[in-house]
């Protein structure tokens, strides 16, 4: 046999072995086929193979069928079928199945709302170390079944122990405000906020910033630390964090006054739904502060702030309409500002109406 032919045979054998190895690595079980189909959006094929897996006793297949029917992926939404498959999965100790089952009982989807059934399903998932199920138990005991504050704290704590940021954040709020029958302690609040912030919860970072800024952390005021936490909160799309940074730069509080940076932070916050930040942008446009003076943009931003419930924005907007001789709109918006609790808006409303 020539060397050339031998090389061809060796190469062929190598590639055959490689393909066989790769094929062997690929999961060709019903569940494996279903998962690959699901990833590429072929939901009908995925459902078919998840069902085969479920019928073979693979609990994850049952859970995935529940998800498909709950969300209407490749089929119409069918909460009753979702409930059936989640129940089967949960009976087989599948924590995601128990979580899904708890959610349907919690919301009353595909069945009558039943908090006890929801508690049972979530509790099983929580024991199986499913963080969100622990958190949802906290929510039920906190907000839906009154008189169970101690249970709420227990389950929020479990979710926090499993690194669920919002569980840690809620405990931080509880200790800061003295909610859920815990003894008020800013020191404990900081501990929980710190963990939640490290887990990238923007609300917790903002809360830390406020505590350090105001010296309420049972520590000395530390503006640099406060600023750092507010920056992180803003980077995590927390509108209050961005708004606080905007105020710092606008007033030159703890930082060098910088109207342009203030405007940029207010814009970020406004775009994320901070009513007061929209109103502050309106003021900056009305004064030509860091941006060219533009009364049209001032009016638009005051309107955004007012629409989102900022009484100062409503007051300023009404004043602009009054100056434009539009008494009807001025009255309507002063009325809104008055209802939002601004005394001066109420006084101006009385003057314009004459009563």
What is each of the regions a protein language model found here?
Residues 20-44, 48-49:
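N-terminal leader/linker segments that initiate helical-solenoid repeat arrays
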Residues 27, 336-355:
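Terminal, low-structured helical/coil segments at or just beyond the last alpha-helical repeat
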Residues 30-37, 64-71, 100-107, 136-143, ...:
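Hydrophobic face of amphipathic alpha-helices that form TPR/SEL1-like repeat modules
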Residues 37-38, 42, 55-58, 71-73, ...:
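Short helix-capping/linker turns of helical repeat alpha-solenoids
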């Amino acid at each position: 046999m020539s060397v050339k032919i031998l090389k061809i045979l060796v190469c062929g054998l190598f590639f055959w072995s490689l393909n066989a190895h790769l094929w062997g690595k690929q999961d060709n079980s019903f569940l494996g086929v279903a998962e690959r189909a699901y990833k590429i959006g072929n939901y009908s094929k995925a459902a078919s193979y998840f069902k085969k897996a479920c019928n073979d006793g693979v609990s994850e297949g049952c859970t995935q069928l529940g998800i498909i029917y709950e969300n209407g992926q490749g089929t119409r939404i069918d909460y009753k079928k979702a409930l059936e498959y989640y129940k089967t999965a949960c009976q087989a100790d599948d924590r995601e199945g128990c979580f899904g089952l708890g959610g349907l009982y919690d919301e009353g989807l595909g069945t009558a709302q039943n908090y006890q059934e929801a508690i049972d399903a979530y509790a099983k998932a929580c024991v199986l170390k499913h963080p969100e199920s622990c958190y949802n138990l906290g929510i039920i005991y906190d907000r839906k079944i009154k008189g169970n504050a101690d249970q709420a704290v227990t389950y929020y704590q479990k979710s926090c122990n499993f690194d669920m940021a919002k569980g840690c954040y809620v405990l931080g709020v509880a200790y800061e405000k003295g909610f859920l029958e815990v003894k008020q302690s800013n020191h404990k609040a900081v501990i929980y906020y710190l963990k939640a912030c490290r887990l990238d919860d923007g609300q917790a970072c903002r809360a830390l910033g406020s505590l350090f800024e105001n010296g309420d952390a049972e520590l000395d005021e530390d503006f640099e630390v406060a600023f750092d936490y507010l920056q992180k909160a803003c980077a995590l799309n927390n509108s209050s964090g961005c708004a606080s940074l905007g105020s710092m730069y606008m007033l030159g509080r703890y930082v060098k006054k910088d109207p342009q940076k203030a405007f940029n932070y207010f814009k970020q916050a406004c775009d994320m739904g901070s009513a007061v930040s929209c109103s502050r942008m309106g003021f900056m446009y009305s004064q030509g502060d860091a941006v060219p003076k533009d009364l049209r943009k001032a009016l638009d931003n005051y309107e955004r702030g007012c629409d989102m419930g900022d009484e100062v924005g409503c007051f300023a907007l009404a004043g602009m309409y009054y100056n434009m001789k539009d008494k009807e709109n001025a009255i309507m918006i002063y009325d809104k500002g008055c209802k939002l609790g601004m005394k001066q808006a109420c006084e101006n409303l009385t003057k314009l109406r004459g009563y």
